């Protein structure tokens, strides 16, 4: 069997998603999902036919929502497939390099490892901003730069001006990919308005977070017409199933967009409530500012708290293994009941810190 497996695959460490880790509990605050069940109803009687390669009705709906023309949109199976197809399309194995800035979303690293792509890794600064000085030193001959915006797991935006400086400083053969998985929580900061200004700019979007549709795996790549045409060459022949496209189309009708925006306001309200209450807990050392539907918290001793929360049936995401995030846990913003339960459990903690 060893002879069958390429060396870079045999040593590969897969992405540890919340579901893959598989810890069981009663309150899940570990995957940055919407805490509310989507009310979309669906019935199918057309499952005997293959779906459209790129469902036109869905393209039209997302075009209206995003303000991006239809021919500048590619529908993918979540933003993760967007990362995968961009890397696979534009990078040659063991030749090309990508760049990213940890601690950040780990799929940039995992997909580079899958396709045996070289990596230039520039850690962010202690203030969670981009290290422009070191980026400029190592930016030559990089094929793709991935920027998570707002960043996961830190929750903050990188300086827009610094990102523009990076785009202006690279050659036309370097692609800048802005991962906007969480942008709906602060939509006014989107880079969509810059698409027509830069030929090498790509934006990733998803319906998993603000739209509450994590289960259907539906994302979008936004770029110029030429890049979208190239990506279509590599995309699977039937990437979006009929049930997925039908549900996504419904989610993008005006009524459901209004509900999504209402849920965002609920999340922001719950986040403020949660932060205000957590500030009263003495063993919490820092609550980092977040523009997303989660917060990053530094504890006096995170491993103890992580295990304690599991014992109480509350599942959060351990980030203490990530560079610069010692004793940090990432907590998704849940319902007001879930937030209050988390506060109650943390408030009565009597263990050793």
From Swiss-Prot:
<keyword id="KW-0028">Amino-acid biosynthesis</keyword>
<comment type="similarity">
    <text>Belongs to the class-II pyridoxal-phosphate-dependent aminotransferase family. Histidinol-phosphate aminotransferase subfamily.</text>
</comment>
<dbReference type="InterPro" id="IPR015424">
    <property type="entry name" value="PyrdxlP-dep_Trfase"/>
</dbReference>
<dbReference type="InterPro" id="IPR004839">
    <property type="entry name" value="Aminotransferase_I/II_large"/>
</dbReference>
<dbReference type="GO" id="GO:0004400">
    <property type="term" value="F:histidinol-phosphate transaminase activity"/>
</dbReference>
<keyword id="KW-0032">Aminotransferase</keyword>
<dbReference type="GO" id="GO:0000105">
    <property type="term" value="P:L-histidine biosynthetic process"/>
</dbReference>
<comment type="subunit">
    <text>Homodimer.</text>
</comment>
<comment type="pathway">
    <text>Amino-acid biosynthesis; L-histidine biosynthesis; L-histidine from 5-phospho-alpha-D-ribose 1-diphosphate: step 7/9.</text>
</comment>
<dbReference type="InterPro" id="IPR001917">
    <property type="entry name" value="Aminotrans_II_pyridoxalP_BS"/>
</dbReference>
<dbReference type="InterPro" id="IPR005861">
    <property type="entry name" value="HisP_aminotrans"/>
</dbReference>
<keyword id="KW-0808">Transferase</keyword>
<protein>
    <recommendedName>
        <fullName>Histidinol-phosphate aminotransferase</fullName>
        <ecNumber>2.6.1.9</ecNumber>
    </recommendedName>
</protein>
<keyword id="KW-0368">Histidine biosynthesis</keyword>
<dbReference type="Pfam" id="PF00155">
    <property type="entry name" value="Aminotran_1_2"/>
</dbReference>
<dbReference type="GO" id="GO:0030170">
    <property type="term" value="F:pyridoxal phosphate binding"/>
</dbReference>
<feature type="modified residue" description="N6-(pyridoxal phosphate)lysine">
    <location>
        <position position="209"/>
    </location>
</feature>
<keyword id="KW-0663">Pyridoxal phosphate</keyword>
<dbReference type="InterPro" id="IPR015421">
    <property type="entry name" value="PyrdxlP-dep_Trfase_major"/>
</dbReference>
<dbReference type="InterPro" id="IPR015422">
    <property type="entry name" value="PyrdxlP-dep_Trfase_small"/>
</dbReference>
């Amino acid at each position: 069997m060893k002879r069958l497996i390429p060396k870079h695959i045999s040593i590969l460490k897969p992405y540890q998603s919340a579901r893959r880790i598989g810890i069981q509990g009663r309150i899940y605050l570990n995957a940055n999902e919407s805490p509310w069940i989507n009310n979309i109803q669906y019935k199918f009687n057309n499952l005997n036919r293959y779906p459209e390669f790129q469902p036109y009705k869905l393209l039209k709906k997302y075009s209206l929502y995003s303000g991006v023309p239809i021919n500048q949109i590619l529908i993918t199976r979540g933003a993760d497939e967007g990362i995968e197809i961009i890397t696979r399309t534009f990078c040659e194995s063991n030749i090309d390099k990508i760049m990213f800035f940890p601690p950040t979303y780990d799929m940039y690293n995992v997909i580079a490892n899958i396709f045996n792509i070289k990596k230039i890794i520039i850690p962010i600064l202690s203030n969670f901003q981009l290290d422009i000085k070191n980026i400029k030193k190592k930016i030559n001959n990089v094929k793709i730069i991935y920027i998570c915006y707002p960043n996961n797991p830190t929750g903050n935006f990188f300086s827009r001006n610094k990102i523009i400086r990076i785009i202006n400083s690279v050659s036309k053969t370097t692609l800048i990919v802005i991962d906007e998985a969480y942008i709906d929580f602060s939509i006014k900061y989107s880079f969509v308005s810059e698409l027509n200004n830069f030929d090498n700019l790509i934006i990733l979007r998803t319906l998993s977070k603000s739209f509450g549709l994590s289960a259907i795996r539906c994302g979008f790549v936004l770029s110029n017409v030429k890049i979208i045409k190239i990506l279509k060459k590599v995309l699977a022949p039937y990437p979006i199933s009929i049930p997925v496209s039908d549900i996504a189309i419904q989610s993008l009708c005006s009524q459901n967009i209004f509900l999504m925006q209402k849920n965002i306001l609920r999340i922001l309200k719950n986040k403020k409530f949660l932060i205000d209450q957590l500030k009263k807990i003495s063993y919490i050392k820092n609550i980092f500012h977040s523009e997303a539907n989660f917060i990053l918290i530094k504890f006096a001793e995170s491993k103890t708290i992580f295990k304690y929360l599991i014992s109480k049936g509350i599942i959060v995401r351990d980030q203490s293994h990530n560079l610069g995030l010692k004793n940090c846990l990432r907590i998704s913003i849940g319902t007001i009941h879930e937030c209050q339960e988390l506060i109650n459990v943390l408030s009565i903690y009597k263990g050793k810190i």
